[in-house]
Curated annotation (Swiss-Prot):
Keywords: Ribonucleoprotein, Ribosomal protein, RNA-binding, rRNA-binding
Record-linked InterPro entries: Ribosomal_uL22, Ribosomal_uL22_bac/chlpt-type, Ribosomal_uL22_bac/org-type, Ribosomal_uL22_CS, Ribosomal_uL22_sf
Entries under Pfam families matching the protein: Ribosomal_L22
Lineage: Bacteria, Pseudomonadati, Thermodesulfobacteriota, Desulfuromonadia, Geobacterales
GO MF annotation terms: rRNA binding; structural constituent of ribosome
This protein's name: Large ribosomal subunit protein uL22
SUBUNIT field: Part of the 50S ribosomal subunit.
Top-level taxon in the UniProt lineage: Bacteria
GO biological process: translation
Length: 111
């Protein structure tokens, strides 16, 4: 049985978030959470919360053994980019791009 969790419009760069997501793909839940706990990346905290949410979803569905869950698929898609402007000298303006990410996690039981 599979359980999913999604996080939309996270104010994180998709490129930087993919580095964190690649560390936990295919690992068991406890191993993945420990890996994220000691990662210095800011996106690791949100990904660990998302994994915990997916585990809670699995418990609600009635998965027999939560300890047998592993990260089947996890991926990051780019969301909308918030565009802002900063005033510069001589009446100019510079563009600031604030990227967002959509993260999706699918957990499954080991056979």
């Amino acid at each position: 049985m599979e359980s999913t969790a999604k996080l939309s419009f996270a104010r994180l760069s998709p490129r930087k978030t993919r580095l964190v997501v690649d560390m936990v793909r295919g690992k068991g839940i406890q191993n993945a959470l420990n890996t994220l706990r000691f990662s210095p990346q800011p996106s690791a905290k949100l990904v660990s919360k998302l994994l915990s949410s997916a585990v809670a979803n699995a418990e609600q569905k009635g998965v027999a053994d939560v300890d047998r869950l592993y990260v089947k698929t996890i991926y990051v898609d780019g969301g909308t980019v918030l565009k802002r402007f900063v005033p510069r000298a001589m009446g100019r303006a510079s563009k600031i791009r604030k990227p967002t990410s959509h993260i999706c996690v699918v957990l499954a039981e080991k056979k």
